[in-house]
C-alpha cells in the first residue's frame, strides 16, 4: 500500500497574472480568441509541469476555468439562461463571458448571473439559474479537451468535476418556483456521458467534488446522494471530494455511496482520522487533506505525519492539499523582499506541493528527518518578537461592554445627524472608490518603485482627489467620497499602515473572473502606529461644503480578506484590528469628518459553514464592528457596506451592528434582498444598490426609478438612500459618469413625486 500524493486543484491565473491580462485584452478587443485560448493552453501546461517537478504524482485536470469553475459546470450542462443564449443554441467562450459580465448575444445589455462567495472563502462563483422544465445537455467540452491536452503531454491525471448535488445546491430557481432538487434526474445523464467519455480516454480516477457534504444539509438533500451516485458508478473510480470542514456528521450518508474513495479536509477536520478509518469501507481509499490549501503558512509536517501515520498500511492512503490550491499564491521563491525570518514561515502553492512530496516520502520510508528540518521555522515562530506585542494584548484584555456601545440609541443619533447634515429625501452617494485609471496606478507604482518622490506623489494624489470631488459636485451627489486614489486595495492599504501585517510582491489569488487580490498576511499582534486616512479625508472635505465620508475597511473584512495567523483565534485578530481602527474613527471625527463608513462586505462570508457554529462567530464579529465604531459621537453618522449577501438568516446581527446607514448589494437580485429588512422591520437607514458595478452596462433612469420604487414598497422612503452596489474602482470614467448621472436624475425625479 504505497502512499501517493495529489492536489485538488492549482492556481489558474499564472505567476504574473497572465490569465487576467489575456482575458482583459480579449474583452477590450485588443487580441483574438485564439490568442486567449493559447494563453490558457500555455498556463495549463506550465502548471501541470510545475506540480510534477515539485513531486506531485497525480495531477488535477479540469481545475482551470476561464471565469469560475461553477460557471464552467453550467456550460458543461448546457445551463445557459435564455437572455445569454445564441440563437442556434451553441455555446462558446463568449457565452461564458456574457454570463459572467452581463451582455446579450446581440451586444445589448443583459443582466449578468448573480455572483456570490464560494462557501466561506474569498473566491466567487456565478450562481446557476434554474427554471421549471429546464433541459440539460453536454454542450461545452472544456473538461474533455483539457484531459486530451494533459494525456498528450504524458501526464498521470485525475479529472476534476463539480458534483451534481452540490451544483444544484449552489443554484437558484428563477421565475415560477419549484424544488431545484427535482432537476437531479435531468442532469445525471450529462454526468454519465462525461464519465463515459473520460473512461474512453483511459482515465482511472475522477475527483468529484461534493463540498455540500460538509454542511448541515436538509434530509431530502442528503437522501439525494445515494440515487445520484448509484447512477454514476461503474465507469471510472470516483474520489468523492469534500473540503472546508470535516465530514463526521454526514458519514452515514457518505459511507452508503458506491464510490471508491473519499477525500477529507483534515485541516478543519483534524480529529477525524480514527473515526474515518473505523467507519469507511475497508476497500475505500482515504485521501488525507493534510496541507492547508487556503493559507500561506508552512505546515508543521511532523504534526501532519503523526496525524495520519497510524492508518498507513491499514488502507490505501493518498496525501493531498485540504482543498484546491486555488486559494493560495503560486510560488514563494519569487518573493525577494520578504525578510528571511518571515519568509521561512511561509509556503505557497508550489511549496505546498513540495510538502506533499516530503510527507509521501516519509510515510513510505518511515524516515522523518526531512520533516523535522522542514518544520523547524514553525517552532521558532512561536517565540518570535515579530509575533507578540504585550501592549496590544493588554489593551485587548481590558475591553469592557461599554467599549462597544454608542452614546445613544439610533433614534437620538438620527435626530442629531439630520440637524447636522440637512440632507434631501433620497440622498445620493457612492460606496467609496472611483475609477483607478492607468494614471493613478502609474503614480502609485512610480512612488513604490522610488521613481517618484513623496512630494510629487502627494501632489498627484491630491489632484486626483480634487478631480473626484469636482466630478461628484458636477453630478449633483449629496454625500461625497474622496475616491481612494491612494489605495491599491481596500484591505491591503490598511494592512500596509498597521503593525502586525506583511505583504508579498506576487502573492496574487483569484477573486472572480479576471479580478485578483493580493491579501496581506497577519503575522503578529495588530496595532496602529499613526493615523491612516485622516489627511486625505480632511483634504477632500476642505474642497467642498458637502459632507465627505471617511472610508475605513472593517475589522472582520480585513481579517477575512487577509491570510490570518494560525496561532490565535480569528476573534482575537478581529478585535485587535477593531481597536486599531477605533483610534482612526476618533481621529477622523476630531478632523471634522462627520460621516464615516466602515465597510464589512465580508461579515457573512466569515460565517462557519455549519449553522450550529454561527452564533459564536456573529457575537464576536458584531462586537468587533461595535468596538471599531462606538467611539463616534451622536452626530457622527456611521455607515457600513455589505455585498454578495443573503441577509435573512443574520438580520439580528446586522441590526446589532447599530450602523446608522447600511448600503447593500441588491441590483443583481432585483431588490429581493430587501425582503429580509422588511420582514425584520429593520430600524435604521438603508441604501439598496441600484445598479451592478461589476457590469459595464449603464442603467437607465427608468430602470433605477423602478428599482427604487420597488425598494420603497418594502422600506419607508424616508429611510432609503440611493447608491451603486459597490465601489467603482474597476469601472471606466465614461460609464461611471453616465451611470451616476442617471442615478442622481432618478433620485431627483422621486423627490419631485
Swiss-Prot record:
It is an enzyme of class 2 (transferase). Zn(2+) binds at residues 641, 643, 665, 726. GO terms for molecular function: 5-methyltetrahydropteroyltriglutamate-homocysteine S-methyltransferase activity; zinc ion binding. Pfam families: Meth_synt_1, Meth_synt_2. CDD domains: CIMS_C_terminal_like, CIMS_N_terminal_like. 5-methyltetrahydropteroyltri-L-glutamate binds at residues 17-20, 117, 515-516, 561, 605. InterPro entries: Cbl-indep_Met_Synth_N, Cobalamin-indep_Met_synthase, Met_Synth_C/arc, UROD/MetE-like_sf. Its cofactor is Zn(2+). L-homocysteine binds at residues 431-433, 484, 599. Binds 1 zinc ion per subunit. L-methionine binds at residues 431-433, 484, 599. One of its GO terms (biological process) is methionine biosynthetic process. Its EC number is 2.1.1.14. Belongs to the vitamin-B12 independent methionine synthase family. Catalyzes the transfer of a methyl group from 5-methyltetrahydrofolate to homocysteine resulting in methionine formation. This is 5-methyltetrahydropteroyltriglutamate--homocysteine methyltransferase. It comes from Enterobacter sp. (strain 638). The gene is metE.
Amino acid at each position: 500500500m504505497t502512499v501517493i500524493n495529489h492536489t485538488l486543484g492549482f492556481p489558474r491565473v499564472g505567476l504574473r497574472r497572465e490569465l487576467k491580462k489575456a482575458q482583459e485584452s480579449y474583452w477590450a478587443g485588443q487580441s483574438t480568441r485564439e490568442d486567449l485560448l493559447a494563453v490558457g493552453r500555455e498556463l495549463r501546461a506550465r502548471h501541470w509541469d510545475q506540480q510534477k517537478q515539485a513531486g506531485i504524482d497525480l495531477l488535477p485536470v479540469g481545475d482551470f476555468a476561464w471565469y469560475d469553475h461553477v460557471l464552467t459546470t453550467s456550460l458543461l450542462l448546457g445551463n445557459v439562461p435564455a437572455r445569454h443564449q445564441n440563437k442556434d443554441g451553441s455555446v462558446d467562450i463568449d457565452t461564458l463571458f456574457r454570463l459572467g459580465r452581463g451582455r446579450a448575444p446581440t451586444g445589448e445589455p443583459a443582466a449578468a448571473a448573480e455572483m456570490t462567495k464560494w462557501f466561506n472563502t474569498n473566491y466567487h462563483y456565478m450562481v446557476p439559474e434554474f427554471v421549471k422544465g429546464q433541459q440539460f445537455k453536454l454542450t461545452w467540452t472544456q473538461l474533455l479537451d483539457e484531459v486530451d491536452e494533459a494525456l498528450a503531454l504524458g501526464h498521470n491525471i485525475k479529472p476534476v468535476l463539480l458534483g451534481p448535488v452540490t451544483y444544484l445546491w449552489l443554484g437558484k430557481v428563477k421565475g415560477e418556483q419549484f424544488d431545484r432538487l427535482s432537476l437531479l434526474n435531468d442532469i445525471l445523464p450529462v454526468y454519465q456521458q462525461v464519465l463515459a467519455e473520460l473512461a474512453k480516454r483511459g482515465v482511472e480516477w475522477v475527483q468529484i467534488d461534493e463540498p455540500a457534504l460538509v454542511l448541515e444539509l436538509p434530509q431530502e438533500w442528503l437522501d439525494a446522494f445515494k440515487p445520484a451516485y448509484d447512477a454514476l458508478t461503474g465507469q471510472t473510480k470516483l474520489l468523492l471530494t469534500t473540503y472546508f470542514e470535516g465530514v463526521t456528521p454526514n458519514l452515514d450518508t457518505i459511507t452508503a455511496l458506491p464510490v471508491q474513495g473519499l477525500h477529507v479536509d483534515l485541516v478543519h477536520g483534524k480529529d477525524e482520522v480514527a473515526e474515518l478509518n473505523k467507519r469507511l469501507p475497508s476497500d475505500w481509499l482515504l485521501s488525507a487533506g493534510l496541507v492547508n490549501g487556503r493559507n500561506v503558512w508552512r505546515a508543521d509536517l511532523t504534526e501532519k505525519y503523526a496525524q495520519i501515520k497510524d492508518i498507513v498500511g491499514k488502507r490505501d492512503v493518498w496525501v493531498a492539499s485540504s482543498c484546491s490550491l486555488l486559494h493560495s499564491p503560486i510560488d514563494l521563491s519569487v518573493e525577494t523582499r520578504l525578510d528571511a525570518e518571515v519568509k521561512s514561515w511561509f509556503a505557497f502553492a508550489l511549496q505546498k506541493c513540495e510538502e506533499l512530496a516530503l510527507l509521501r516520502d516519509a510515510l513510505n520510508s518511515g524516515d522523518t528527518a526531512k520533516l523535522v528540518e522542514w518544520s523547524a521555522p514553525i517552532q521558532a515562530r512561536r517565540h518570535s518578537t515579530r509575533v507578540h506585542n504585550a501592549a496590544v494584548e493588554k489593551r485587548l484584555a481590558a475591553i469592557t461592554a461599554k467599549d462597544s456601545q454608542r452614546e445613544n440609541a439610533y433614534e437620538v443619533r438620527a435626530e442629531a445627524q439630520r440637524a447636522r447634515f440637512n440632507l434631501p429625501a433620497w440622498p445620493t452617494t457612492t460606496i467609496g472608490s472611483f475609477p483607478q485609471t492607468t494614471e493613478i496606478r502609474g503614480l502609485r507604482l512610480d512612488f513604490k518603485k522610488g521613481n517618484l518622490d513623496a512630494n510629487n506623489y502627494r501632489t498627484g494624489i491630491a489632484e486626483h482627489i480634487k478631480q473626484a470631488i469636482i466630478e461628484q459636485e458636477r453630478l449633483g451627489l449629496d454625500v461625497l467620497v474622496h475616491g481612494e486614489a491612494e489605495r491599491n486595495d481596500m484591505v491591503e492599504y490598511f494592512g500596509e499602515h498597521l503593525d502586525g501585517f506583511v505583504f508579498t510582491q506576487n502573492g496574487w489569488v483569484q477573486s472572480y473572473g479576471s479580478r485578483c487580490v493580493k491579501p496581506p498576511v497577519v503575522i503578529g499582534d495588530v496595532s496602529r502606529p499613526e493615523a491612516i486616512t485622516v489627511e486625505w479625508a480632511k483634504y477632500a472635505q476642505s474642497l467642498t461644503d458637502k459632507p465627505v465620508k471617511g472610508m475605513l475597511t472593517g475589522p472582520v473584512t480585513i481579517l477575512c480578506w487577509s491570510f490570518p495567523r494560525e496561532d490565535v483565534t480569528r476573534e482575537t485578530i478581529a478585535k485587535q484590528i477593531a481597536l486599531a481602527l477605533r483610534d482612526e474613527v476618533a481621529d477622523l471625527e476630531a478632523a471634522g469628518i462627520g460621516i464615516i463608513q466602515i465597510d464589512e462586505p465580508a461579515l457573512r462570508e466569515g460565517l462557519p459553514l455549519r449553522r450550529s457554529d454561527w452564533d459564536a462567530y456573529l457575537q464576536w464579529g458584531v462586537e468587533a464592528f461595535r468596538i471599531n465604531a462606538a467611539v463616534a459621537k451622536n452626530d457622527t453618522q456611521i455607515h457600513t457596506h455589505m455585498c454578495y449577501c443573503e441577509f435573512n438568516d443574520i438580520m439580528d446581527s446586522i441590526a446589532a451592528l447599530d450602523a446608522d446607514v447600511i448600503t447593500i448589494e441588491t441590483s443583481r437580485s432585483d431588490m429581493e434582498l430587501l425582503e429580509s429588512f422588511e420582514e425584520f422591520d429593520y430600524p435604521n437607514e438603508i441604501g439598496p444598490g441600484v445598479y451592478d458595478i461589476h457590469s459595464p452596462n449603464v442603467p437607465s433612469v427608468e430602470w433605477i426609478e423602478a428599482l427604487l420604487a420597488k425598494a420603497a414598497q418594502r422600506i419607508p422612503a424616508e429611510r432609503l438612500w440611493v447608491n451603486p452596489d459597490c465601489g467603482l474602482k474597476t469601472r471606466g470614467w465614461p460609464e461611471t459618469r453616465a451611470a451616476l448621472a442617471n442615478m442622481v436624475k432618478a433620485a431627483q425625479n422621486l423627490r419631485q413625486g
